[in-house]
Amino acid sequence: MGLPWYRVHTVVLNDPGRLLSVHIMHTALVSGWAGSMALYELAVFDPSDPVLDPMWRQGMFVIPFMTRLGITNSWGGWSITGGTITNPGIWSYEGVAGAHIVFSGLCFLAAIWHWVYWDLEIFCDERTGKPSLDLPKIFGIHLFLSGVACFGFGAFHVTGLYGPGIWVSDPYGLTGKVQPVNPAWGVEGFDPFVPGGIASHHIAAGTLGILAGLFHLSVRPPQRLYKGLRMGNIETVLSSSIAAVFFAAFVVAGTMWYGSATTPIELFGPTRYQWDQGYFQQEIYRRVGTGLAENQSLSEAWSKIPEKLAFYDYIGNNPAKGGLFRAGSMDNGDGIAVGWLGHPIFRDKEGRELFVRRMPTFFETFPVVLVDGDGIVRADVPFRRAESKYSVEQVGVTVEFYGGELNGVSYSDPATVKKYARRAQLGEIFELDRATLKSDGVFRSSPRGWFTFGHASFALLFFFGHIWHGARTLFRDVFAGIDPDLDAQVEFGAFQKLGDPTTRRQVV
């Protein structure tokens, strides 16, 4: 046939049996990839420290998606929340991976069957004897079935009526676990951070899909609409399907990057905006302030800060810090976090508490500046020592740690003080193991960043695909050069070109 690579799909254009076959094969490939990727991730995943080395630090991509749907246990005897388990049941991580691989194999066989037995009676128009598909009817069937699946997920799986529920956590990502969720039918259901909205929206959308599917099964489209939207052309289906996919991809890119109840920070890592807004820092200071109000010492108040909360308040966990072409997990960048050193409090020789100005997201380097409670610069690490007025040595800055591994330890040696001031620019200070994975010290993005980049990129590509195929199907007659109003019979093999009076005609 000699088709160029970008036109090979025309071989299934008027062949419904093999069109079905290649779609089943595509499903086999997707499902097979998902199952295989899950097994690979499980082979390299270390579940030993869910606080300082969670799945998103290790670059896991499919494990978080399984976990948010209620899978938490492994046949290896571990649980994602830490600790060991004795009876994980069939729906463990490995069980889900295996189910995808088995399903992939069945789809593979079905694809081969439909490729061989392509000329089925069901695809044949009894009036003409030619292969054809009743596309509006197929649309109704698919809408109905997807509505049933959507409703079932929201009404049974998410609510725990028949299923585990979904991953639910607090606003600071500390207490996450899988639990049933009640639908939120009020205005709060439209808050993207309210899990109840997931249940109610799936129930509502599923109900709408079921009703719309039944409508399209029982009502035929008007002839003018059928012709105007080219409902008899398979390329119309391709165009509108691409539209649905790119729209969904844009939506999920947004919910992933900006955060939502569907993308918990315990599974995908924090968002960049939580660093930009000092979200975790404010909560930490609020908790310390509450402790001090209860007559706790600074050391006691800081010691009660969960290590998990302190770890979120570290710039290395910001997904916007990784470069687009820096491959690998976060652990391959700044290393595996081993422990929290504690919160450093800097003071000058007059006893004023100083705060290190934190590095903004898009800076690779940033001057070390220490300000007092009023925002007045009191100390810095100067670029030119000859002109310095606020150097650590001149101001006499000291540092003392509260909470963490260095609790109660203080330093007055300028070199050490400057070292910790530099590290305090990056948020809370952690001991990081860079030897185990030969980490290079350059920040990486989390799966949150990869997912967003991938889906936004493909959504843009698919948007152009929608425009392309939509234009092709709507203006097919124009592109082919056939007059749409032509009713005279034209000689076979010679098409009437628009405005061409020389085309041979024959009287019927």
UniProtKB/Swiss-Prot annotation:
It is a multi-pass membrane protein. The chain crosses the membrane at residues 21-36, 101-115, 140-156, 203-218, 237-252, 457-472. GO terms for biological process: photosynthetic electron transport in photosystem II. Keywords: Chlorophyll, Chloroplast, Chromophore, Membrane, Photosynthesis, Photosystem II, Plastid, Thylakoid, Transmembrane, Transmembrane helix. Binds multiple chlorophylls. PSII binds additional chlorophylls, carotenoids and specific lipids. It is found in: Plastid, Chloroplast thylakoid membrane. Its main location: plastid. It holds the Pfam family PSII. GO terms for molecular function: chlorophyll binding; electron transporter, transferring electrons within the cyclic electron transport pathway of photosynthesis activity. One of its GO terms (cellular component) is chloroplast thylakoid membrane. It comes from the Eukaryota. Belongs to the PsbB/PsbC family. PsbB subfamily. PSII is composed of 1 copy each of membrane proteins PsbA, PsbB, PsbC, PsbD, PsbE, PsbF, PsbH, PsbI, PsbJ, PsbK, PsbL, PsbM, PsbT, PsbX, PsbY, PsbZ, Psb30/Ycf12, at least 3 peripheral proteins of the oxygen-evolving complex and a large number of cofactors. It forms dimeric complexes. One of the components of the core complex of photosystem II (PSII). It binds chlorophyll and helps catalyze the primary light-induced photochemical processes of PSII. PSII is a light-driven water:plastoquinone oxidoreductase, using light energy to abstract electrons from H(2)O, generating O(2) and a proton gradient subsequently used for ATP formation. This is Photosystem II CP47 reaction center protein.
